[in-house]
Amino acid sequence: MKTLNRRDFPGALWPERIIQFGEGNFLRAFIDWQVDLLNEHTDLNAGVVVVRPIASDFPPSLSTQDGLYTTIIRGLNEKGEAVSESRLIRSVNREISVYAQYDEFLKLAHNPDIRFVFSNTTEAGISYHAGDQFDDAPAVSYPAKLTRLLFERFSHFDGAQDKGWVIIPCELIDYNGEALRELVLRYAHEWALPAAFTTWLESANSFCSTLVDRIVTGYPRDEVAQLEESLGYHDAFLDTAEHFYLFVIQGPQWLARELRLDKLPLNVLIVDDIKPYKARKVAILNGAHTALVPVAFLAGLNTVGEAMNDAQICAFVERAIHDEIIPVLDLPRNELESFADAVVSRFRNPYIKHQLLSIALNGMTKFRTRILPQLLAGQAQMGTLPPRLTFALAALIAFYRGERNGEGYPLQDDAHWLARFEQLWTQRGDNTITLRELVDAVLSDCEHWEQDLTAVPGLAAQVTRDLDAILNQGMRHAVAPLC
């Protein structure tokens, strides 16, 4: 069986216009996949140079396959049908190592055609490293490496205004573009680089914050033989991902034209502020996950897919989203409804087995950040507690009992909550506290909730009633009126 290379699999080789820091599965199934589509259907004509930003030779370089690899996109399409689509990605020209090929790395700045810089160097990648110096070959941190590369470009082109870059980080931190820009400016200042360089950084370059959304499941280890047989070639860089994707870029509107998004309408939004889109994702996608987990698990289910194929639990989740989460969010209703429909479809993806217990990790913090804002906003707007989000809080407290049908299961949270719940449920079992006292103890933890939730009118009483129903009637019976 042949291995992918450009001799045996000839095709277009695009001029290098994109630098990408990061060789991992996510960028290959997200950025490079989109660039490949744009190259095929528009005149973007952009080749990608992947820069490996760390000192590691594992996995092997993409250059061993001349940059070629296959994506397999799997999930439910817009019609709810299970689909699996393979695509040979040709957008990556080569990979270089910033550690083994530092001179080659700096030479990228001399290419007049380079216009875009994408990155995913993990959440810790956009950070300050005190020891980084201008003459390091290379510096340790990604922002320092980028600063050195930008200065190389500034120097080579004598500060030409038309040689700046559009810098689009994909790291999962809030306002990643602004954070990266601040660090680049910090290094420029600490390294005493010319004031003209700082001016050029500000005037000729655009740092864009982003929100990225796609579940990338990566190399399909258990299915490789079967997939390669159907493809007809060996591919050491096979990359699998879900059907859904969303790319929100906070940047100038001319960016849509530069990326040729006016010619191929991908699911990419160029917006003035990513904040409402971040809030939408956290509230609907992450919030629904967090509400679902304790309810579904205590109802006897083990995966998200099982839960969404269960009529009762699915109805609970959908009504929580549409009746209690969406009404308090600050985006057009039709956009929120469309996103919510996509979320439900993603939860049903038969190709992804999401274990409820793995999503349950740090559930107390997740509830505070993902659900509590909508619960409190709903109570403030409507004057009544949103019943499903309130029930989800009761279910969460029941979940931290650590027992389902007489059997234990592992709980994963910070040590404070694990110890506190063990103490409270032991006291309840000994009848030394009432159920209401247990609920009050949880809701009054101001250090965690950043407020005393027993002060929210009716909340402690309703959580106690819901918790009593879960414990005495079972989850199925307790949740039924809310489905």
Curated annotation (Swiss-Prot):
One Gene Ontology cellular component annotation held by this UniProt entry: cytosol
One Pfam short name: Mannitol_dh_C
GO molecular function: mannitol-1-phosphate 5-dehydrogenase activity; tagaturonate reductase activity
SUPFAM superfamilies linked to this entry: 6-phosphogluconate dehydrogenase C-terminal domain-like, NAD(P)-binding Rossmann-fold domains
GO BP of this protein: D-galacturonate catabolic process; mannitol catabolic process
Pathway listed: Carbohydrate metabolism; pentose and glucuronate interconversion
Signal peptide: none
Keywords, comma-separated and alphabetical: NAD, Oxidoreductase
Enzyme class, UniProt record, top EC level: oxidoreductase
InterPro entries referenced in this protein's UniProt entry, alphabetically: 6-PGluconate_DH-like_C_sf, 6PGD_dom2, Altronate_OxRdtase, Mannitol_DH_C, Mannitol_DH_N, NAD(P)-bd_dom_sf
Enzyme Commission code(s) on record: 1.1.1.58
Catalytic function, reaction form: D-altronate + NAD(+) = keto-D-tagaturonate + NADH + H(+)
Binding site for NAD(+): 18-29
Family: Belongs to the mannitol dehydrogenase family. UxaB subfamily.
Protein name (record): Altronate oxidoreductase
Originating species: Cronobacter sakazakii (strain ATCC BAA-894) (Enterobacter sakazakii)
Lineage: Bacteria, Pseudomonadati, Pseudomonadota, Gammaproteobacteria, Enterobacterales
Gene that encodes it: uxaB
